[in-house]
Amino acid sequence: MILLRHGQSEFNLLFTETRKDPGIADPVLTPLGHRQAEAAAEALARRDIRRILVSPYRRAIQTALPVARRLGLGLTVTPLVRERYAFSCDIGSPRSELALAFPEVDFAHLEEVWWPPAEEPAAQVEGRAALFRAEMAALDDWAHTLVVSHWGFIMALTGRSVANGESLEMDPTAPAPAAISWRHP
C-alpha cells in the first residue's frame, strides 16, 4: 500500500513561516502544493494502483485528483484517514460544499459534518489508524491501494513523519509501530 501526504496547503505555508495557527479552515493547496500533486501523479503513474482512498479534506482531494485522472480511477472518500484534529486547518468542509467544489467525486456516503467537534487525543487517532490497518490487512489487494492522507494519520499508522507531497510504502500486515512520537518537524 502506498501512503501519500497531501501537497503543501495554505495552512502549511503560513504555519511553517510563523509557527502560529493562521486560522484557515480546510485550506486548499498552494501553487507548490499543486506542483507536488502533479509530481506525485507522474511518479505513481507507473505503479499498479487499482484503488485510491482519500481523506475528505480539500487539500487531500486536490492532491489525489491528478493521480486519479492519470490512472483513470475514481476516488473513495473516507474520513477514517482524515487528519488528527488539532488546528484550524482540521475543521473540514461540509459534504454539500465538497460536492459543489468537486463534482467528479462521490460524497453521497459522507456525513454532512464528518470531522470531530474538538481536538482529537493521540490515542483516538492511533485507534483510527489501528482500525484502518486491520481493514486493509483483511483485503487481498491492499498492495494496489493508494491512500492520500495527512501528517498525523500517517504518523499514527507508520510512526514516520512525511513531508508534503511525500509518499511511502506500508504493509498493513506488518506490526504497528511500538510507539508514536507526535513531534512535528
Kindly label every feature range from the protein language model.
Residues 45-48, 136-143:
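Glycine-rich phosphate-binding loop signature in dinucleotide/nucleotide-binding domains
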Residues 9, 153-154:
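Short active-site segment of divalent metal-dependent hydrolases/proteases
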Residues 13-14, 18, 23-28, 70-131, ...:
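Phosphate-handling substructures
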Residues 1-4, 53, 143-153:
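Beta-strand elements within well-structured catalytic alpha/beta cores of enzymes
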Residues 1, 84-104, 140-141, 155-185:
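Acidic, low-complexity terminal tails and accessory targeting/binding regions
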Residues 4-77, 101, 122-123, 165:
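Active-site-proximal alpha-helix that buttresses catalytic centers in soluble enzyme cores
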Residues 54-58, 80-81, 110, 148-152:
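Short, well-ordered beta-to-alpha junction loops that form the rim of enzyme active sites
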Residues 37, 41, 129, 133, ...:
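Short amphipathic alpha-helical/adjacent loop interface patches that line ligand
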